[in-house]
Amino acid sequence: EDGDPAKGEAVFKKCMACHRVGPDAKNLVGPALTGVIDRQAGTAPGFNYSAINHAAGEAGLHWTPENIIAYLPDPNAFLRKFLADAGHAEQAKGSTKMVFKLPDEQERKDVVAYLKQFSPQ
């Protein structure tokens, strides 16, 4: 089943401790997520990323809906696996600032559907 943007808006309230989305969104503890869909990881303007996030972006990670859905249950494990699979295991050091986890698959699909509304199609 695809995500429901209305339900995703409710799920996104959990993310708002660190993130904002929308035309006036600013970086907080986490980067603003306006335009995040298909964006290269580690490239939100003006945000100071952790080394592992920056390395994943340099290694080619883009925030496709599928990658976001795979990332949210365990951000650090996802980034380490991505870097290892890309042949950059030596850069999989440290951890992302994102300690929040979203284990429920339907909630992940819903929040991606919500974020898609703020990204050019």
Swiss-Prot record:
SUPFAM superfamilies linked: Cytochrome c
GO biological process: photosynthesis
Binding residues for heme c: 15, 18-19, 98
Record-linked InterPro entries: Cyt_c-like_dom, Cyt_c-like_dom_sf, Cyt_c_1A/1B
UniProt KW DNA-binding keyword: no
Segments forming a coiled coil: none
Keyword Cell membrane: no
Gene Ontology molecular function, alphabetical: electron transfer activity; heme binding; metal ion binding
Record-linked Pfam families: Cytochrom_C
Keywords: Electron transport, Heme, Iron, Metal-binding, Photosynthesis, Transport
Post-translation changes: Binds 1 heme c group covalently per subunit.
Family: Belongs to the cytochrome c family.
Functional summary from the UniProt entry: Cytochrome c2 is found mainly in purple, non-sulfur, photosynthetic bacteria where it functions as the electron donor to the oxidized bacteriochlorophyll in the photophosphorylation pathway. However, it may also have a role in the respiratory chain and is found in some non-photosynthetic bacteria.
Name the record gives this protein: Cytochrome c2 iso-2
Source organism of this protein record: Rhodospirillum centenum (Rhodocista centenaria)
